[in-house]
């Protein structure tokens, strides 16, 4: 009889590789035998808080895997190119056959191998990819030892304890602990650079390293609240939020892609200087710097048409300031990104409340679909 996640003990996997011909030939790697000799390894004392992390780790780790991608050698203008390992990261079991990871982990591979925490390897194939959310789904040829992990429908408050499980630097079954440090962050989409940001991201102080990407950020009841994605320095890591996972992943499984709403505007944050230059009552809302020609907002919203000097700084003037969408307050750029990402679909008409020439008015904008990255 299959044991539940709560009954299965996790086994920390070692660094391992696999042949590009398949995923059954794991080779080499570091093990506990690599510990320094001549000194007794003393385990630290267990504290009152430790059992929480032990329990959640043992419940979650069988459902987490290391993801390794490979490419075949390709002909280039300089001759045959080198093939071999292309990318490495982590992933977690979303349902019985599908593993969620990051799009930047998957890339465009010829072979995907997944290593479970019992050190077995299985082949996987790409089901769907979404560069704009940096999420991807692969289908496994065989199951993992654990059960699918539940995904939260909302984000926990700042200060909630979390655990990140994955394969940093190829070290399968690794765990780091921390708290939720922030919510509603926006981070660059690494596989769609310079175009759009990932909305509603979760921030954590748990250590993230190369290879953690795609692994779950879980609360101490084993619920996924984020997918580890990026780090911006010591104790500053980010993950795709569970709310965005719930939006994107079902579509990737069903159709292989996800369509993001597109308003067709470039925006900047309203700070005190911009507010002063535009005679705004306070530094709140999102300033429309430009409108994409022939885009959804063209002819409806207004972008910058001048500039002013405030305290020696040049600020844009004349653009609309978005203060609400469908009656929901938009206080800053992350609010706008989050609402479009979680509450709308291409083709929806949204009521955009703006401050224009000192007065509020509400205008209808029918959203389009983001262009290909």
Model features per residue range: what roles?
Residues 149, 160-196, 235-237:
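Flexible, gly/ser-rich surface segments that form the specificity/activation loops bordering the active-site cleft
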Residues 47-55, 70-96, 120-125, 148-150, ...:
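A conserved glycine-rich beta-strand in the N-terminal activation segment of trypsin-fold
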Residues 16, 105, 313-316, 324-353:
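PDZ domains, with a preference for the canonical peptide-binding region formed by the helix
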Residues 93-165, 170-173, 330-331, 349-351, ...:
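Conserved active-site neighborhood of the chymotrypsin/trypsin-like protease fold
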Residues 73, 207, 257-324, 328-335, ...:
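PDZ/PDZ-like groove recognition
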Residues 92, 207-227, 297-303:
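Catalytic nucleophile loop of clan PA
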């Amino acid at each position: 009889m299959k044991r539940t996640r709560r009954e299965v003990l996790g086994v920390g996997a070692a660094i391992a590789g696999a042949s590009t011909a398949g995923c059954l030939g794991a080779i080499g790697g570091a093990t506990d035998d690599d510990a320094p000799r001549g000194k007794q390894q003393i385990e630290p004392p267990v504290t009152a808080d430790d059992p929480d992390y032990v329990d959640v780790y043992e419940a979650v780790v069988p459902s987490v895997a290391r993801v390794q991608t490979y490419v075949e050698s390709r002909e280039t203008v300089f001759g045959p190119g080198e093939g071999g390992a292309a990318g490495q990261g982590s992933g977690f079991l979303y349902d019985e056959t599908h593993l969620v990871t990051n799009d930047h982990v998957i890339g465009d591979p010829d072979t995907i191998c997944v290593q479970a925490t019992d050190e077995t390897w299985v082949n996987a194939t790409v089901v769907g990819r979404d560069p704009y959310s940096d999420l991807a789904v692969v289908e496994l040829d065989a199951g993992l030892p654990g059960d699918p992990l539940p995904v939260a429908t909302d984000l926990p408050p700042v200060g909630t304890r979390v655990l990140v499980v994955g394969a940093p630097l190829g070290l399968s079954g690794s765990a780091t602990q921390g708290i939720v440090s922030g919510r509603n962050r926006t981070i660059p989409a690494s596989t769609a650079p310079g175009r759009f940001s990932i909305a509603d991201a979760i921030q954590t102080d748990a250590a993230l390293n190369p290879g953690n990407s795609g692994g779950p950020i879980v609360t101490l009841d084993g619920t996924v609240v984020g997918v580890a994605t990026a780090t911006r320095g010591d104790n500053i890591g980010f993950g795709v939020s569970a709310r965005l996972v719930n939006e994107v992943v079902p579509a990737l499984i069903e159709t292989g892609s996800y369509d993001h709403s597109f308003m067709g505007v470039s925006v900047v944050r309203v700070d005190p200087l911009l507010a002063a230059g535009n005679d705004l009552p306070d530094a709140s809302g999102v300033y429309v710097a430009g409108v994409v020609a022939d885009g959804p907002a063209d002819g409806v919203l207004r972008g910058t048409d001048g500039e002013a000097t405030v305290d020696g700084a040049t600020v844009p003037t004349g653009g609309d300031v978005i203060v609400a969408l469908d009656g929901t307050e938009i206080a800053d750029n992350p609010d706008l990104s989050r609402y479009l990402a979680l509450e709308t679909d291409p083709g929806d008409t949204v009521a955009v409340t703006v401050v224009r020439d000192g007065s509020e008015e509400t205008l209808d904008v029918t959203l389009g679909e983001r262009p290909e990255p």
